[in-house]
Amino acid sequence: MSRFLSNATNRIDAKGRVSVPSAFRSVLAQRNVQELYCFQDFVFPAISIGGPDLLERFERQIAAEDPFSPDANEMSLLIHGGGVFMKLDAEGRLMVTDFIRGFTGISDEVTFVGRADHFQLWQPQAFVAAQAQARGERKLAGKRS
């Protein structure tokens, strides 16, 4: 099965592009993803990225709600108002736009984080801190990490 796993940090080039890790590009190719759906994560200061199926999953959740309900409107605000479509260039690079930089605080490096069915873009130190916090919370709760 193709899953986005692990993490890797890559430097942004002078033109504002970053190479997507080859393992992540392989998953995108296996899934035949041509266009990336990118949205501002609901919990973390990260950009979540997947194929159009990720957007479709959220839209099915909205469609199951009363279209005038606060839940449906809030979800639409997040996934439509906080989302964009992007493409990788021929060399497997992603343009690190103001949309990405402004939400994440990314400047010269990007940490790619696998999240099974999608991946995320993080400012490297923010990822390290969030991972340490998650590990600490699990340890306090007596759960194995």
UniProtKB/Swiss-Prot annotation:
One of its GO terms (biological process) is negative regulation of DNA-templated transcription initiation. The keyword Transport does not apply. GO terms for molecular function: DNA-binding transcription factor activity; transcription cis-regulatory region binding. The keyword Ribosomal protein does not apply. One of its GO terms (cellular component) is cytoplasm. Its main location: cytoplasm. It comes from the Bacteria. PANTHER family: TRANSCRIPTIONAL REGULATOR MRAZ. Forms oligomers. This is Transcriptional regulator MraZ. It comes from Rhizobium johnstonii (strain DSM 114642 / LMG 32736 / 3841) (Rhizobium leguminosarum bv. viciae). The gene is mraZ.
